[in-house]
Amino acid sequence: MLTKIPLAALLLLAASPLCAQNGWFQPSLLAKPEVHKALQSVDDRASDIVEEWIRLVETPAPSGKEQARAKYIRAEMEKLGLSEIRTDDIFNVSGVRKGTGGGPTVVFAAHMDTVFPEGTDLKVKREGDILRGPGIGDDTSNLMATLEMFRALDRGGVKTGGDLIFLASVQEEVGLLGARHWLETSGYRPDMFVAIDISSTEVWYGALRIDQFKFFYTSPGAHTLESRGAPSPAKAVAKAINALYEIPLPPIAEGFGSFKLPTINVGMLGGGTVANAIPREAWFTVDLRSLDSATQDRLESAVVSTARRIGEQEGVGFRLERKMGIDYSKALPQKERLHHPLVQTALATSNYFRKPGTPEIAAKDAGANDSNIAVSMAIPAVAVGAVLEHMPHRLEEYAEASSMVPGIKSLIALAVALTSH
């Protein structure tokens, strides 16, 4: 049975000066013989890790079709001797590395899916330290790092007080569906949740408001020869998309790096069956992202009313489907999340192992990954990264191979600190 550590006790620890600075991490932890051995083993396997990383990248895993990767990860969990290994009905794979007892239970989650459809050329190209290929970073690099972290703990003979759960999730890229399903149905209620799903230059402890919609316009249709002046769903889609991008947005929030928030994005559109007819139906999707609920609610109202108005103007039918929305009404208050020892520990370990010459990492009250679901359930959560990755969600995506080893070491330090304090 998984141990639940009272939140009040965790927050009391967070109030101490030592915890406020480094959370539960102290560099002396790395000098323990078993931890040192685990860290050294990562150095010894550096080239093999990169080769396996490349093989994982070249294994297709579009959202909803992660079965090949799931099979591989499950087999590796079995080799590790994890307990309670499960592949659920949507192909999330999880396993538990049992602790000695008395410590918190912590989930380390990396998602298996990528945004790239079947048929994408996934061949990885090497250019010195640079690895180029779709999915090389998001999130295959972190999946590889998490797997290797669990292996290294075993190689070092590291014992943790609490249980460590390895969750390889699915469908993160299409609404965090895998993490939601696992947290709602697995029967586990972890004390803390760590998503390994960003670049190693970041630590996120919050959750963006993310809402996704699919808008449909419909009509009876008509042959091209009868189309002049007739209501057209295609025309409505074109006008609606243009109108949505004309909606005034608040100033870009500062302090979030490349994030330009709030934002409206049309990511998909389609409709029709032949070239020589008005389509009976045409559709497009909208992804809204904001830092706060008030801004998001105003954007949602503006987007929905604009899309509906265009339908009325064009004389076509209109309907919408909400594809994603997360209720954060139960989330812990911002200050409690920021000052939780989990966040401070993640900051300390990430900064300890960060690339020399790079800026100090600061925690951001944001998030667009599996940790969002944990945040919404009042589970202390954070998102970290293991690798320096660049241009995610693009065919030109690339990552720095040499960043993998220190990234894995950072995860080892984080896992031991969180479960053995």
Question: Can you describe what each PLM-predicted range is?
Answer:
Residues 22, 235-239, 243-246, 294, ...:
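His/Asp/Glu-rich mid-to-C-terminal helical/loop segments that flank catalytic regions of hydrolases
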Residues 130, 135, 139-216, 256-257, ...:
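Acidic/histidine-rich catalytic neighborhood of metal-dependent amide-processing enzymes
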